[in-house]
């Protein structure tokens, strides 16, 4: 599966923003910095004209395109809300409570249904979102603050000294 994420970075220009993300995604030993993804394309990948080549074309500068920057943040919020609504429709809290009781009754062993059931998976996914963990469902990462929380970039936009160096860099992650 593929997911388009936007990373917030501070840089002097579009090129620097792009290279910050490109450089940081691969660790010194060659592993991907994002542990849930096996490969990625910086610049939008399948959402861009470049497809599978890194490209700076879709990088958004707040200084050059403040409205588009804010629109992208609002779109990310909407995507996150949609994910949470999907989880809300799928989670069965009564079943989860029953699974916990059964686990305790079964000497700390999950049943086959518990091990392979989707209810626990949706609950885990929901908890990760509530904790601002960086997952395929985050759609956003703040590389300045090292978090999936979106509030910090919005605070930086309100700071008169910092909005002009804010960039959103798109990444097509495969997982």
Residue ranges, per PLM feature:
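Acidic, proline/glycine-rich low-complexity IDRs
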Residues: 1, 125-175
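Short, extreme N-terminal segment that most often corresponds to the first beta-strand
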Residues: 1-36, 163-175
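A sequence-composition feature that detects small, non-aromatic residues
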Residues: 8-11, 17, 63, 89, ...
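Phenylalanine-focused residue identity feature
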Residues: 18-19, 69, 96, 116, ...
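Low-complexity, serine/threonine/proline-enriched polar segments
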Residues: 27-140
